[in-house]
Amino acid sequence: AILHTEPDWQAFAQECRERLEAFTGDTERQMDVLREQHHAQLFRLLAQDLDGVLSVERLADHLSALADVLISVTLEAVWQTLSGRHRDQPQFAVIAYGKLGGKELGYASDLDVIFLYDDEDPEAPAIYAKLAQRFITWMTSHTPAGILFDIDIALRPDGASGLLVSSLAAFEKYQHQSAWLWEHQALTRARFCAGDHNIGAHFEALRIQVLRQTRDPAQLRSEILGMRQRMHEAHPNRSEFFDLKHDAGGMIDIEFIVQFLVLRHAAEYPAMTGDIGNIALLKLAGDLELIDSQLSVAVSD
């Protein structure tokens, strides 16, 4: 019966905290506890999935909620291991992008995240960089219980050449003055997922502000099409089978269409900034008559 009950993520988070606390000071055991908890919940969701009681959307919601909880409790546990911490609670947040950001996580998805802080302490940049580094280690290390998640931090400001953590002020300046269009596209599927809720609220306000900028439609279309073409050329399909993700008419094409619709119309239709997933955004675009409503339903299906 437990296998087939709806997950209670709040109770699960509390259970994780209690089990982690029981092994305070034993980092390796704490890391295994997180992995064991993850595996148990994955098994439950897989059982429900195989029984056909979960829609694709509902399963993705649960997998994303599971990741959110594990990110949150891991962040809390890691903070307690830092000898240089200067406050009880870090003024630090994890922002989710990509599949986690859009609550479209699959069983084997990696996590696209960036790290933001809002702290005037002169030691803050160094402390939060150490927090982020240790958080990544806890998530990605191979232990006897496996790994928790693969982490991708390529979407941080300035990419591979950028700092691991960004102050909220620097991130805001970057988005307004330096970010490429593809970085604004990425914001269509970004959300706060763990840490300081005040930073989360500031991030969401900034995200909406950026997405609602007035843009030249022709230039926007040209840039997005050019970017999509470069991606297509980087993933040639040499097989005789259709590549559901990369081929023309595949998932990435649909994602780019949704991102274009958001960046093109959010200034006039604020509802288009909602982080509600590609399917819901397509249906919303149809309801708002931005695209043919029958087409939006067909593509969503």
Regions found by a protein language model. Give the residues of each.
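A nucleotide- and high-energy phosphate-metabolite-utilizing enzyme signature
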Residues: 1-301
